A protein has these predicted regions:
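A short, N-terminal "cap"/entry segment at the start of jelly-roll beta-barrel domains
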Residues: 1-35
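Conserved short histidine dyad/triad with adjacent acidic residue
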Residues: 35-51
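Surface-exposed loop/turn positions
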Residues: 43-45, 79, 87, 95
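Short glycine/proline-enriched turns and hinge-like loops at secondary-structure junctions
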Residues: 50-52, 93-94
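Ligand-binding loop in jelly-roll beta-barrel domains
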Residues: 85-110
């Protein structure tokens, strides 16, 4: 078994998500460790949270805000934010974000108030 995996995020099919469109690398049932997402936020995202997942956002393009438990944080390229389980969050503004998710993304762990 190979001890590495390779993905080309710009060639990965986009899927709708609460933040806009997400291209998900390493998203498969046998992978429980981590996933990497390229997220294009074209409008204000829907507030949501995760009970198990920790997300780390790296802003690649655009400027705007991340709302984290009701606090509005200004972000710009290379701003990096770790979002722990239970933190209600959403992006506000048009941005491209690299999102590292640990453990691997689980669509059943997206919660809305």
């Amino acid at each position: 078994m190979q001890r590495y995996e390779f993905a080309q995020l710009d060639s990965t099919a986009g899927v709708p998500c609460p933040c806009g469109t997400s291209r998900r690398a390493f998203f498969k049932p046998e992978n429980v460790l981590a996933t990497t997402h390229l997220v294009e936020i074209s409008a204000d995202a829907r507030t949501h949270y995760h009970k198990r997942l920790t997300e780390t956002y790296v802003i690649l393009e655009g400027e705007g805000f991340l709302e984290l438990d009701g606090e509005r944080i200004p972000v710009k390229p290379l701003s990096t934010i770790m979002i722990r389980p239970g933190c209600r969050h959403r992006a506000v503004g048009k941005m491209k974000v690299l999102n590292f998710v640990v453990p691997a993304f689980d669509p059943e762990d997206e919660w809305f108030d």
